[in-house]
Amino acid sequence: MNKVLITGATGQTASYLVEYILKNHPEYEIHCTRRWRSREENIESFKDKVIWHDVEMKDYFNVFGVMNKIRPDRVFIYSASSYVRDSWAQPWIYMEENVSHAMHVFNSVLMINNIDFETLQVKLDYNPKIFVALSSEEYGKVPWGTQLTEDSPLAPSSPYGVSKVALDLMAKVMYESY
């Protein structure tokens, strides 16, 4: 059976993804992460239909433990601090959380594959597809009606946007390197 891991599944966007997969891909075993303090209003429709893992995504060993235990075929990283206005008050939290959550997933895959950190050689016996949730905030303030593509210039205008650009670039580096 194919396994999917969705981090931050109690959030608005990730909860829609869970509902979509449940409806359209019943062949998937769905694993979701949540924090002990997660609000549950977005998950009422599927709370008992998925396998929950209480994970603090800032804690690498928590993330590694879940990744190593279930070895998902696909990982959707939605866990993040996502309030643009609040990012101005605590920009370091946004940078740390929004990048480290994904880095812990990436590094878990490398560790499961026994990467040699001296030579950076890794034999990818376990190679899940990893999807990272990004944001239009990466492009900053653009004129109304402007069509954005992945090739549009990155010009974040908030600490939250900067954290998502850093995440975007790190995901690209990891993809191209491994």
Regions found by a protein language model. Name each.
Residues 1-178:
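N-terminal Rossmann-like NAD(P)+-binding domain of SDR-like oxidoreductases, especially those catalyzing
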